[in-house]
Amino acid sequence: MKYHDLRDFLALLEQQGELKRITLPVDPYLEMTEIADRTLRAGGPALLFENPKGHTMPVLCNLFGTPKRVAMGMGQEDISALREVGKLLAFLKEPEPPRGFRDLFDKLPQFKQVLNMPTKRLRNAPCQEKVWQGDEVDLNRIPIMQCWPDDAAPLITWGLTVTRGPHKERQNLGIYRQQLIGKNKLIMRWLSHRGGALDFQEWCQAHPGERFPVAVALGADPATILGAVTPVPDTLSEYAFAGLLRGTKTEVVKCLSNDLEIPASAEIVLEGYIEPGEMAPEGPYGDHTGYYNEIDNFPVFTVTHVTQRENAIYHSTYTGRPPDEPAVLGVALNEVLVPILQKQFPEIVDFYLPPEGCSYRLAVVTMRKQYAGHAKRVMMGVWSFLRQFMYTKFVIVCDDDINARDWNDVIWAITTRMDPARDTVMVENTPIDYLDFASPVSGLGSKMGLDATNKWPGETQREWGTPIKKDPNVTARIDAIWDELAIFHDGKGA
């Protein structure tokens, strides 16, 4: 599925009935959230609010409101094809040279995709068609949504933040929410382990007291946005990965006020800096947990330039108790994660992050168990392999006869194959999501692993239970006469 920028993608969505234009006046204050939430829960289309109250700039919501649209953004037709994206990432994370001529041909598609990795630098770009700078900058021109009644202020949610550390050649792209606190001021809420925060820390050490350049792209093409939330290898830039997804090189242009490179087709770009030591209290905000988060101090982003396309579109979303857009995104990205994990742990059959678990706080793993203690090795591997699982509080490991995505199966395994004392692993004083108020200390808490596998010799001294299995001959005989029995007139139960 080929597209060049966000507008191309919206045209594709509209052709397929996946985009709804809203012409009635709708307020960015609470009303857009209510409409977007109802639409997402019904599996509805992306929404383009063409007449936001008090503004002339349209607002795009629910862009990734179904797994299908996430897959389309990654250049695929449906969610099942995302396993191939995961296989490509697994290959790039640990590339293997071809083992002979036939293997070379098998790997040719992957090598061809790599040709789309380098960025294409432009001198002039659509994102700089209109420019405001200095006193002309007024972020109130943008219809920034306020999503929940007790939110502190309007909040930018889909800002693609571009940074570069002082000792790094490649840039970091990350999605960090930003609270509006003035006509040219935002609070940059990034956690200390995230790429942007690490770049800032390194900058402050290398250039004490100097301003840290930052750019925020709003309304980038979907491949670039998704590249920023996908577990790409550290050696691969998000722009390069976006080129792989899109099938064409990512076009970038240099900022007007600094040397950062931004997506050339972005709808809006905010350029500016963070002054070391300038902090402000952020929040509270309703978040993907379903609760308002605590207030905490984060750096202030001062905007010196706003550039945009003609007739720019503002891309936004809301976060709340699942299902919300991040939860849907998590369902789709789950398919990308499976091949990456299987590359490192071939015994893993499936891996599932239930959306009701905030998309990352609980994981279910099914595996082909091969020895006593194997399940514990896998759960430790899940916690340590990808930083995306740093905040996963619960890991449930089951055998491969269990469907990881069926709670009936998983709960049966937990209640019949686990002894709580023997099969529960507790790990204390580990990194925990700052938004997790259940932990005793902010950012530090415990994790639990549940070994719900059948136990092997060495793990139990008792004879293990034998699962009940039907007689296949009897099943076949009853299948043959089932309709004749007419127990269910509507065919139910067959």
UniProtKB/Swiss-Prot annotation:
- Stored Pfam families: UbiD, UbiD_C, UbiD_N
Obligatory cofactor(s): prenylated FMN; Mn(2+)
Q: Where does Mn(2+) bind?
A: 172, 238
Domain of life, per UniProt, equals Bacteria
Reactions performed catalytically = a 4-hydroxy-3-(all-trans-polyprenyl)benzoate + H(+) = a 2-(all-trans-polyprenyl)phenol + CO2
Record localization: Cell membrane
Keywords from UniProt, A to Z, are: Cell membrane, Decarboxylase, Flavoprotein, FMN, Lyase, Manganese, Membrane, Metal-binding, Ubiquinone biosynthesis
Mind listing the GO molecular function terms for this protein? 3-octaprenyl-4-hydroxybenzoate carboxy-lyase activity; metal ion binding
EC number assigned by the record: 4.1.1.98
Gene Ontology CC, one term: plasma membrane
Ligand binding (prenylated FMN): 175-177, 189-191, 194-195
Q: Which GO terms describe its biological process?
A: ubiquinone biosynthetic process
Which coarse location class applies to the principal site listed for this UniProt protein? membrane
Q: How and how many cofactors are bound, per the record note?
A: Binds 1 prenylated FMN per subunit.
What's its membrane topology? Peripheral membrane protein
Catalytic residue positions: 287 (proton donor)
- Name-wise, this protein is 3-octaprenyl-4-hydroxybenzoate carboxy-lyase
- Gene assigned in the entry: ubiD
